[in-house]
UniProtKB/Swiss-Prot annotation:
Function: Has bacteriolytic activity against Gram-positive bacteria. May play a role in resistance to Gram-positive bacterium S.aureus infection.
Phenotype when the gene is knocked out: Simultaneous RNAi-mediated knockdown of lys-5 results in a reduction in survival following S.aureus infection.
EC number(s) per entry: 3.2.1.17
Name of the protein described by the UniProt record: Invertebrate-type lysozyme 2
Signal peptide (UniProt feature, chain positions): 1-18
Organism: Caenorhabditis elegans
Residue ranges of every copy of the I-type lysozyme domain listed in the record: 19-138
Length: 139
């Protein structure tokens, strides 16, 4: 019975995470591969409007041997699977910065995605979070 409860909880968490990611994607690009655009003085690219330092922080998923970081970043950002992997990696790298805030996983993911490693502490990310929350109802 305990194993069954853990399995059901894991499935529920996976769905909540997928809903949260989808809503972040919708907020950033309508969940479309929109290429790169200037945003606050630097390029943001793809489904999640990822900037190059964010791509570096998420571990540069999908980067091929001998490929420049810039080429890999732009390609990854316009590939939904790769870009989603980057956002998940970024969340996992920086979620500890938000321990003790009482924020749920989706709020931490959304606010850090929008505001950087300590975005969960920045009041400027609240509007972004409210938009994501209204999409999925996630916490």
């Amino acid at each position: 019975m305990f194993v069954k409860a853990i399995l059901l909880l894991s499935i529920a968490v996976a769905y909540a995470s997928a809903d949260c990611l989808h809503c972040i994607c919708m907020r950033e690009s309508g969940c479309k591969p929109i290429g790169c655009h200037m945003d606050v003085g630097s390029l943001s690219c793809g489904y999640y409007q990822i900037k190059i330092p964010y791509y570096e922080d998420c571990g540069q998923p999908g980067k091929k041997h001998g490929e420049s970081t810039e080429v890999a970043w732009k390609r990854c950002a316009d590939d939904l699977k790769c870009a989603t992997n980057c956002v998940e990696n970024y969340y996992n790298r920086y979620k500890h910065e938000c321990a003790g805030t009482g924020q749920g996983a989706c709020e931490v993911m959304a606010r850090n995605h929008n505001g950087g490693p300590r975005g969960c502490h920045a009041s400027g990310t609240l509007g972004y979070w409210k938009g994501v929350h209204s999409c999925c109802g996630c916490s």
